[in-house]
Amino acid sequence: MPVRVGINGFGRIGRNVLRAIAEAGRTDIEVVGINDLAPVETNAHLLRFDSVHGRFPGEVTVKGDAISVGNGLIKVTAIKEPATLPWRDLGVDVALECTGIFTSKDKAAAHLAAGAKRVIVSAPADGVDLTVVYGVNHDKLTPHHKVVSNASCTTNCLAPVAKVLNDAVGIDKGFMTTVHSYTNDQPSLDQVHKDLYRARAAALNMIPTSTGAAKAVGLVLPELAGKLDGVAIRVPTPNVSVIDFKFVAKRATTKDEINGAVKRAAEQQLKGILGYTEAPNVSSDFNHDAHSSVFAMDQTKVMDGTLVRVMSWYDNEWGFSNRMVDTAVAMGKLI
């Protein structure tokens, strides 16, 4: 039986989760409910037409209070409080909390009260049972994990790389900069924002700001807890981001050893999660790439044997949404 999921919040991630399931033709998971405060016709329109990822690869129609996608009919509601969502009636196994609002275990657990058996938050979340980066630590999931976080798109990019390199040469300490496309958290023109950097026009500026993505790797890989930090620079592109990661190796290494370790992992245990490229690529080449992280081989630098710099691309929307799907299936199997 497929894992039955309900999506709360049909924004960039919510829509891409549904699209990822549809595009892959997955039969191990199905969306049975969507909750979003926008009109159902608006949600259907934004699913059909996407400025970043193009048209939805299939027919999307509105039938009363439901959206028809392919052969499936998905119930759509507009309810503010997650605890009153119809997850029990819809037989929801896993609720995907994609509003960006209910980002703590206490708040996200309202989906359990509504009848969902498990909850995945599409953002870093406080107090959750586990922070999951699929491919890195999803094997730690147990039936006792009821509310988990899917981490962030940036943590999903960095963690596979950090795991491979820590296993290969050891990471004493490291610092990441993510050059990140703008998101809906930023205005198109200057306006009031609690972060004065993010108050500035997204498409007109390179914007230094904060990120907890590097530190969060320690939640996924405890052996790296306290060893990583990072910052973000938001840039005027609508999608695709890149991490620039510098670290001090625990022993002397070479560019060939670093690249070789990543290539082996990408072709074996992390296939489909970690990719690599040997071409002189730019950001648009990775739009709609389902990998969590695509390592740029020609960007690896090593100084004095132990100071290492690497770079890895990620589609911050599409890769993350695909991992939400993978994690939901993994959790569903444990119910």
Question: What kind of feature is each model-predicted range?
Answer:
Residues G170-A232, P238:
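Catalytic core of tubulin tyrosine ligase-like
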Residues K140-T142, R198, V235-S241, V302-G305:
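Short, flexible turn/loop "capping" segments at secondary-structure junctions
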Residues L37-P39, A125-D126, S152-T154, T178-D185, ...:
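Glycine-rich beta-alpha junction loops
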Residues G230, V242-I335:
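C-terminal active-site/capping subdomain that shapes the small-molecule cofactor and substrate pocket
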Residues L18, A109, A159-N166, T177, ...:
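Predominant activation on well-ordered alpha-helical scaffold segments within soluble catalytic domains
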Residues F10, G14, S104, A151-T154, ...:
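Generic structural signal for well-ordered, non-membrane alpha-helical segments
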Residues M1-A199, D326, L334-I335:
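N-terminal Rossmann-like NAD(P) cofactor-binding subdomain of oxidoreductases
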Residues H144-H145, A201-A203, V240-D244, L307-R309:
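Short, solvent-exposed beta-strand edge segments and adjacent coil->beta transition regions
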